[in-house]
């Protein structure tokens, strides 16, 4: 009898898998259309301005540092006497430069790694949306995420695409109870960016809940809680050992002008902007994104978003709002916080298809224009 039921259910499982694969393909196609269009706009703008599109996409701002690490390893320091600042490449985590080096090095290799990671991230974001809200909302979640103001970064030789991919699949594994997969990907996320600690926080907090609240003391749960933060901690300790200072990594960050001041710097910039001081377009966009992120965070809590996604997103918000320096880059720091878009995707999934398409197309167009502005006109890093 059991064998008969299993045989009967096999075709159903096959159909479900095919349906999931088709929907994931639609999500990936939507992502490719939105971000491919954005890259085309940047490339055309670069040609018009007499710039090399590959260098604009693969060698701008932080990309220079990642490519330098990939080519020559760590040890580069740049001093700016005018501002009395020292910039060390130890501020940048090692996984992305390592992958660029393994791919051959240079801007093209950087873009190959980033675009591959961005595609993996899009499918991971879709799977989370599908799991929680259904296939249509999952596709819309990906399209919304690809249409964010700073989503141009997903097509640059930056670490955000890699972090988003590792975070999305780690969180998906965690939601499915695959502890070791979730922890392993979280450890890799911790080797990608400082904010990779958010993925580790999600895995560790959920593991603690299993251990302390639900009484689940399975070895995989213990291992996940210990493994998840290992990547982030190992790099921070390695920099500390190199500089003969346990807090050496945070010293490097302060020398870059980045530190955690519990939101003092953010509030100061917001106050100056709102009190009538000169406000640039990047500052205006940042203010709008931070306000929207705060509102969406409240919506996520009210919608009873699963604990792993809440912890992950809350950690990103604390780091972004609480950090001083690089105010105009805060929307980029929130780019991995895709769970904030779940309530919006759910609402759009209930709307008419024509409305959802129109909203997404409008947001994508704005993202294309702003992305080109950031890379070709703005004087601050994206």
Regions of interest found by a model, annotated:
Residues 156-162, 330-331:
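Short acidic/glycine- and proline-prone juxtamembrane loop motifs at membrane-interface regions
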Residues 34-49, 53, 58, 200-209, ...:
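Membrane-lumen/periplasm interface segments of specific transmembrane helices
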Residues 61-75, 83-105, 263-270:
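Short hydrophobic/aromatic helix or loop-helix immediately within or flanking a transmembrane segment
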Residues 225-229, 350-380:
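Signature aromatic-anchored transmembrane alpha helix within multi-pass, membrane-resident enzymes
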Residues 84-85, 90, 94, 98, ...:
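Loop-to-helix entry region of an early transmembrane alpha helix in multi-pass inner-membrane enzymes
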């Amino acid at each position: 009898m059991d064998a008969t039921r299993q045989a009967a259910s096999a075709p159903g499982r096959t159909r479900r898998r095919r349906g999931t694969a088709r929907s994931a393909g639609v999500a990936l196609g939507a992502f490719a259309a939105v971000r491919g269009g954005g890259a085309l706009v940047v490339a055309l703008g670069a040609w018009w301005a007499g710039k090399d599109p590959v260098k604009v996409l693969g060698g701008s701002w932080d990309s220079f540092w990642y490519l330098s690490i990939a080519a020559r390893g760590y040890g580069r320091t740049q001093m700016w006497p005018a501002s009395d600042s020292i910039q060390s490449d130890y501020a940048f985590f090692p996984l992305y430069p390592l992958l660029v080096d393994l791919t051959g090095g240079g801007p093209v290799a950087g873009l190959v790694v980033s675009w591959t990671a961005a595609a993996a991230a899009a499918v991971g974001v879709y799977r989370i949306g599908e799991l929680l809200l259904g296939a249509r909302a999952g596709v819309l979640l990906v399209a919304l995420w690809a249409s964010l103001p700073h989503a141009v970064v997903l097509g640059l030789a930056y670490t955000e695409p890699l972090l988003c991919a590792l975070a999305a699949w780690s969180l998906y594994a965690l939601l499915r109870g695959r502890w070791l997969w979730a922890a392993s990907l979280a450890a890799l996320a911790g080797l990608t960016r400082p904010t990779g600690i958010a993925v580790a926080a999600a895995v560790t907090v959920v593991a603690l809940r299993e251990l302390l609240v639900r009484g689940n003391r399975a070895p995989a749960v213990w291992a996940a809680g210990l493994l998840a933060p290992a990547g982030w901690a190992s790099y921070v300790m390695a920099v500390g050992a190199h500089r003969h200072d346990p807090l050496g990594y945070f010293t490097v960050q302060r020398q870059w002008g980045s530190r955690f001041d519990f939101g003092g710097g953010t509030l100061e910039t917001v106050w100056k902007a709102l009190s009538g001081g000169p406000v640039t377009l990047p500052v205006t966009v940042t203010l709008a994104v931070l306000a929207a992120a705060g509102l969406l965070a409240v919506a996520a809590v009210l919608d009873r978003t699963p604990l792993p996604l809440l912890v992950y997103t809350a950690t990103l918000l604390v780091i972004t709002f609480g950090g001083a320096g690089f105010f105009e880059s805060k929307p980029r720091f929130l780019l991995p916080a895709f769970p904030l878009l779940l309530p919006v995707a759910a609402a759009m999934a209930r709307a008419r298809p024509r409305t959802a398409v129109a909203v997404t197309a409008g947001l994508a167009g704005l993202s294309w224009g702003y992305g080109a502005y950031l890379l070709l006109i703005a004087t601050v890093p994206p």
